[in-house]
Amino acid sequence: MSQNKLWGGRFTQPTDKFVEEFTASIDFDKRLYHQDIRGSVAHARMLGRQGIIPQQDVEQIVHGLKDILAQIEAGQFDFSVGLEDIHMNIEARLSQKIGEAGKRLHTGRSRNDQVALDIRLYLRDEIVEVVAYLDMLIDSLLEQAEKNLEVVMPGFTHLQSAQPILFSHHMLAYVEMFKRDKGRMDDCLKRVNVLPLGAGALAGTTFPIDREYVAEQLDFPAVTRNSLDSVSDRDFALEFIAASSILMMHLSRLSEELIIWSTSAFRFVDLSDGFCTGSSIMPQKKNPDVPELVRGKTGRVYGNLMALLTVMKALPLAYNKDMQEDKEPLFDTIDTVKGSLKIFADMIREMRVNSSSMGRAAGQGFSTATDVADYLVRKGLPFRDAHEAVGKAVAYCVENEMDIIDLSLAEWQLFSPHFSDDIFAAITVEASVNARDVIGGTARNRVEDEIRRCREGK
């Protein structure tokens, strides 16, 4: 392929070879080839429809672009660093294939609005995939909740036993988080899904183009309303990476819990062998590498967000070469999020829950102490007085190396005369769980309601 620059008319000396390599983006933006060709086909058809270029040229351009697409997908296209980016590589090859007609393609268009279009087309498709992977993960969590509906586990605050809850309730907490992540992705898509083509370099174009026609061809519901803004901003990419950062934070929190739960100290869950690795020296080890890596990759996505924010933070309008640095953080975020979601959905689905370990732990650590306080309140004691009495009972148990379930009625009555025989039924783990019979609570019937709502898409 010829290495002549498509913008070289103003220059009298060739580009320095190191500068050529330093400024080229083809190594990473070649993944936009499909979007670039799709956008060019729509642009060419619009040019012909408007009488800006001959119709026979349009036919040659479209045919040539389809041939190039087939070449790229067959691995037969020779990408050139000397041609800088995916746009110039495709356009130069087109002109080489069909001659003068190929040189008419860029009429009424700049690389500035062209690349903005390519990124939006690409990100639009990727957001749809991310949402599909989120649906897969949510389905896996719901499956675990349904399979282990009655399993009781300790709920934690400060990583200390707090109150017993259903394991299914815990899974539904993450379902809610990932549903909000879906909402953020859907909302981001609305701002991504706007056509920038037609903005030109920054001020629009002198040709009588039809932007609405191009939008229709490319399935955009709207066109951008300011040419300068269209080529100057990447807030739509930033918004996606920000939403992805929150999503990865949720995955990281779940990762941390799975790592803790799978330790020999907890034994709450057993991750499938296919998602773990061993040690090169310790034969007994089964390491939770997948959640550990997802936890680590979360920081990578945070870094991508900060990288792009920093690129954009002080750029004057309109386009600046700094903005070439938008693609690698965006592409890396897309790859990281999709990979993490897919592997997590599969891992959660195959995870085994150790109900006996969870059940034993649920009753430890004075986990039903709040129920005792509530019991006293129902007997007429003010809550703060009830809290004080139960706190003293817990201190007594700690001193005597026992749990509150081991206390006799006589011992209970040391702390309040309001205690009677019905205290023993009130402080079982099962009673504690099912007493939380409020919307969003951990009572079994409420959890079943929420699973049903989730399955119905509410």
Swiss-Prot record:
EC id: 4.3.2.1
Catalytic reaction annotation: 2-(N(omega)-L-arginino)succinate = fumarate + L-arginine
Gene Ontology terms describing biological process: arginine biosynthetic process via ornithine; L-arginine biosynthetic process
Cell compartments where the protein resides: Cytoplasm
Main location: cytoplasm
Pfam families recorded: ASL_C2, Lyase_1
Gene3D superfamilies the record matches: Fumarase/aspartase (C-terminal domain), Fumarase/aspartase (Central domain), Fumarase/aspartase (N-terminal domain)
Pathway field: Amino-acid biosynthesis; L-arginine biosynthesis; L-arginine from L-ornithine and carbamoyl phosphate: step 3/3
Keyword check for Transport: no
Cellular component terms per the entry's GO annotation: cytosol
GO molecular function, one term: argininosuccinate lyase activity
Family: Belongs to the lyase 1 family. Argininosuccinate lyase subfamily.
HAMAP family: Arg_succ_lyase (MF_00006)
Protein's name according to its UniProt entry: Argininosuccinate lyase
